Amino acid sequence: MFLLYEYDIFWAFLLISSAIPVLAFLISGVLSPIRKGPEKLSSYESGIEPIGDAWLQFRIRYYMFALVFVVFDVETVFLYPWAMSFDVLGVSAFIEAFIFVLILILGLVYAWRKGALEWS
């Protein structure tokens, strides 16, 4: 049986990590000066006067690489706690993690065969 008080540190961490960005946005919105002008609407080019239009269309390849990266980054986030408590969880958790990794590998092979990882 799970004891809920063991998860108090998790909920405290979740609450604090959610509150910090919200507070940062609220404080910056209240304390920052509001100045309107053409400089605010122009793109920033490291202090150099911008040349041409700043609106560029990115190739869809960037999107595909980013999507594959996010999938495997999330996989790492899920597997790290499992790896830290592997000795406690036992064989059933190993089988579940193996199935999880197998599904992700199948997704990678599918993306590879469809040409999602090809640059040209």
Swiss-Prot record:
GO molecular function, one term: NADH dehydrogenase activity
Keyword match RNA-binding: no
EC class (word): translocase
Gene Ontology biological-process entries: photosynthesis; photosynthesis, light reaction
Topology of this chain in the membrane: Multi-pass membrane protein
Listed EC numbers: 7.1.1.-
Keywords: Chloroplast, Membrane, NAD, NADP, Plastid, Plastoquinone, Quinone, Thylakoid, Translocase, Transmembrane, Transmembrane helix, Transport
Origin: domain of life: Eukaryota
Catalytic activity as recorded in UniProt: a plastoquinone + NADH + (n+1) H(+)(in) = a plastoquinol + NAD(+) + n H(+)(out); a plastoquinone + NADPH + (n+1) H(+)(in) = a plastoquinol + NADP(+) + n H(+)(out)
Region forming the signal peptide: none
TM helices/strands, residue ranges: 9-29, 64-84, 88-108
InterPro entries: NAD(P)H_OxRDtase_bac/plastid (IPR023043), NADH_UbQ/plastoQ_OxRdtase_su3 (IPR000440), NDAH_ubi_oxred_su3_sf (IPR038430)
Keyword Transferase listed: no
One GO CC term, this protein: chloroplast
Location of this chain's protein in the cell: Plastid, Chloroplast thylakoid membrane
Function: NDH shuttles electrons from NAD(P)H:plastoquinone, via FMN and iron-sulfur (Fe-S) centers, to quinones in the photosynthetic chain and possibly in a chloroplast respiratory chain. The immediate electron acceptor for the enzyme in this species is believed to be plastoquinone. Couples the redox reaction to proton translocation, and thus conserves the redox energy in a proton gradient.
PANTHER family noted in UniProt: NADH-UBIQUINONE OXIDOREDUCTASE CHAIN 3
HAMAP family in alphabetical order: NDH1_NuoA
UniProt family annotation: Belongs to the complex I subunit 3 family.
Designated name of the protein: NAD(P)H-quinone oxidoreductase subunit 3, chloroplastic
Origin species: Arabidopsis thaliana (Mouse-ear cress)
